[in-house]
Amino acid sequence: RVWVSGALPPFAAAVRERVRSLGGRLDESQSPQDAALCIVTPLGEDASACAAREKLDPSRTVAIDVLLGLDKRRTLMTTPLTSPAMREAAHGLFSSDGVPVSVIRDSAGCVVQRVLAHIVNIGCDIAQQGIATPADIDRAVTLGLGYPKGPLALGDALGAHTVLTIL
């Protein structure tokens, strides 16, 4: 059984839908039943902090990064106490459709979240200092680095609240 935290409703809905589509059995209760795999969806925090805040058993808790969706790659984050059986259950479930899954150790937020938020932050700082216009910054990054979006366009897509929460 898989219990998904509802702390971030849009992320929780995406994970619940993915668990269903992968054939996982959802635990729909308010708090996880004994022995259920607990999935949290952190935004700017680690799996341990999520487990502590939500009073979850850290040995059954695994975080999944859903900031950029779940279609191309999935990143799971374990707590220092996550049992190998729960880690393997989460990996097995989320990789069952062939999408690559990476498992990382507990860290201060998910790697992709931190990198993207800092790129946005640096772009905003350059614009705020008047070094370049927002349009020029975005153009330079897309042309010079080959990024699909510039830092300010990325910030607009993610939303200021999301970026600030991650930072």
Task: Tell me what each language-model feature is.
Residues 146-167:
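Interdomain hinge/lid region at the active-site interface
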Residues 25-54, 74-75:
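Short, well-ordered secondary-structure micro-motifs within conserved domains or adaptor modules
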Residues 2-27:
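Short, charged N-terminal beta->alpha structural module
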Residues 21, 54-62, 69, 73-107, ...:
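Internal alpha-helical scaffold of NAD(P)-dependent oxidoreductase catalytic cores
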Residues 11-15, 86-90, 119, 162, ...:
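General structural feature for long, well-ordered alpha-helical segments within catalytic domains
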Residues 1-3, 34-41, 59-62, 71-76:
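Hydrophobic beta-strand segments of well-ordered beta-sheets in folded domains
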